[in-house]
Amino acid sequence: MLGDHKLTWSPIFSVIDFVTRVLSPYQFNPANYNPLRDLVEQSIDFEVLKRPDCPVKLFLSATNVRTGKVKIFSGTEISVSAVMASACLPTMFHAVEIDGEAYWDGGYMGNPALFPLIYNCKSTDIVTVHINPLFRKEVPRAAGDILNRINEISFNSSLMREMRAVSFVTKLIAQNRVVDGGLRRVLIHSIADDEFMGALSPTSKYNADWDFLISLRDQGRKCAGNWLAKNFVKLGVESSVDVDKMYL
C-alpha cells in the first residue's frame, strides 16, 4: 500500500482483482467465508433493534436477485443476514439467502432507498450522506477509472430517480395542486465531500488498513461538523440543497 492509500501496486490486491474477474465467488470462495458477518454479530444487538419500542427505525435495502426488485428489511426482519444482504457485492460474495430468496447489495436498486423514510417516519427531514461522488471534473480514460465511474453512476442512479419524485411532489404541494392531503412535503439535506472522495483511488474501496479507516472517519466527522454549523437552522424549515440542481 502507498502513502496515498492506493492499492494499485499491492501484490495481494492484484491477485484479488484478477481472481474476481475470471472466477465467481462460488468458485474462489466455496465455503462462503465472510469475516464481516462475525464482526457485525459481535457489534450489534439485533434483538434491541427488533423491539416495537426501539427509538431507532432502521431500514436496510437489498436487491432481489431473481426479480430485480428492491427489498426493504425493517422491524423484526432486521438481522445479521439482512445486513449481509444489503452489503453483498456479487463479485466478492455468494448471494445471501433469506426465506428462500437470494439478495445482493441494495445499492443496485436503492442507494439509499428513501421511500421507507417518507412512508414510515414522521420527520420531514431526510439527510443523505454521500460516499460516491456525484460529480467528477475529469472524464476517466484509464480502464480502472472508467469501470469505477460506471460503478459510481450505477449506484447513484436510484437516488437520482427518487429525488426526481421528491422534486415532483414538492412542486405539486407548492402549487396547491394536492387536494386530498395524501402527500407531504419532504426537506432534503446532503452531507458530501466530492473533492475528498473523488481524490481517492478506486482501489481504496478495498483498503481495510486501520489508519486509512480512521482518516475516513475523521474526514467524515469534519464534513458533518461543517454541515451542521452551516445548515442546522434549516432542519425542519427548508431543504439545504437545491434538489433540481444537484440531482436532476
Show which residues each predicted segment covers.
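Patatin-like phospholipase
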Residues: 1-248
